[in-house]
Design a protein with these regions (language model features):
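The leucine-rich repeat
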Residues: 84-88, 93, 109-113, 135-141, ...
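Long, contiguous C-terminal flanking segments immediately downstream of a protein's structured core
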Residues: 2-20, 24-30, 41, 74, ...
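LRR N-terminal entry segment and analogous cap-like coil->beta motifs
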Residues: 10-27, 32-115
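Concave beta-strand-loop units of leucine-rich repeat
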Residues: 19, 77-84, 97, 103-109, ...
Length: 203
């Protein structure tokens, strides 16, 4: 009973944190609403044309100076280790100048989330989805829509099978993109040996 209550409470908090910030958007516009959402999840961001980053501290506290930049789109967002999910991504949908999105270690980022990133196909240049436990090989196929991507980090994804082959497929899908893939055994010879052994068994 206690475990079920804790699970429901956790799920409720996740939904609450990722709710669409329509009220904030109606008063301050989409850029401020996106900024507030990022900070509320203890993330950080940088506006277009600005060098300063706005970040929440470990306690979730942040400066309200970001309100002084109404109608200024976000260029970089760091949501690493936050609980952003597919639903919450709606709060960033109107950020069509977003060039960098860091999602390292996000426990709720999954294949559905990756499929929705096509919204940023005209602007996104750098994407970090390393250490995300819910991403699978099938989800990575959706990244083919991000034709402008220049840097992609897919390091240490536990849900990826045959990482060596997956990296090759990613390089074929995104030939202009530099792919970082640490934390895997890239020994393709081992894969070839396993395939050859399987063929011999079938004979």
């Amino acid at each position: 009973m206690l475990l079920r209550w804790r699970s429901q409470a956790k799920r409720s908090q996740l939904q609450k944190k990722n709710v669409y910030y329509s009220y904030t958007e109606s008063f301050y516009g989409p850029d401020i609403a996106s900024a507030y959402y990022i900070l509320s999840l203890k993330g950080g961001f940088r506006y277009v044309g600005q060098s300063e980053w706005f970040r929440a501290n470990q306690r979730g506290k942040f400066s309200w100076d970001f309100l002084n930049h109404k109608n200024t789109p976000i260029e970089e967002a760091d949501m690493s280790y936050t609980i952003i999910n597919y639903t919450g991504l709606e709060n960033l949908e109107r950020q069509r100048s977003l060039r960098t999105l860091k999602l390292k270690g996000c426990p709720e980022v999954d294949d559905w989330f990756l499929a929705r990133l096509h919204l940023f196909q005209d602007s996104l240049e750098e994407l970090d989805i390393s250490h995300c436990p819910r991403i699978t090989t099938g989800g990575l196929a959706a990244l083919r829509n991000l034709k402008g991507l220049k840097h992609l980090n897919v390091s240490s994804l536990p849900g990826i099978s045959n990482p060596g082959l997956v990296i090759i497929l990613l390089e074929e899908m995104l030939p202009q993109c530099q792919i970082t893939a640490n934390g895997y055994d890239h020994n393709l010879r081992k894969v070839e040996e396993e395939e050859e052994e399987q063929m011999q068994r079938q004979r």
